[in-house]
Amino acid sequence: MDIAVDISNVYIVTQRLILRPWQKSDLNDFYAYASVPGVGEMAGWPHHKFKRTTKQVLQLFIEGKSVFAIEVQENNKVIGSIGFHSSWANDDPEYRHLKAKDIGYTISKDYWGQGLTPEAAKALIDWSFSHMDIDAITVAHFRDNYQSKRVIEKCGFTFVRESTYNARQLNRIIDDAKYIMLRSDISDK
């Protein structure tokens, strides 16, 4: 079952990052990574060809209050996003009784391979189970997105099944893999 999220006053600080609400002043940093071919496509959306597209998405992020900007502490640059979305578990007979949210993330190609996405994801998972009335967090990756698969494995999610995802913005059906982490998985450790 879906739950409401409001991150408008939430700041999560990790060793190298700050997860924080988006601001209009983030537009240039956002466009810098969202306009690079291959970045958005790994998450199901086409890279931004025009800054006005980024501006529209930025406004949706600000108004939606469910997606964080990922800011590097060292240089105060926004290099990605991570946030909550409606979970695939809401439509699954086995899991729909759970209060669940899906997490999704995107990071600048310039920062791939530095362990920043797992750092952000682990912090968001910890915050979620500490501050939200949530039973489960779900996540999925496109089958050929091995970087995302590694992030999911590093975070300790449990594989559920392979499936397909209708990436409407890309006008494609894509094979994906779905994972879940239950609150009980955390409390058992």
Question: Which residue ranges define each predicted feature?
Answer:
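Acyl-donor (CoA/ACP) binding surface of acyl/acetyltransferases
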Residues: 1-41, 71-189
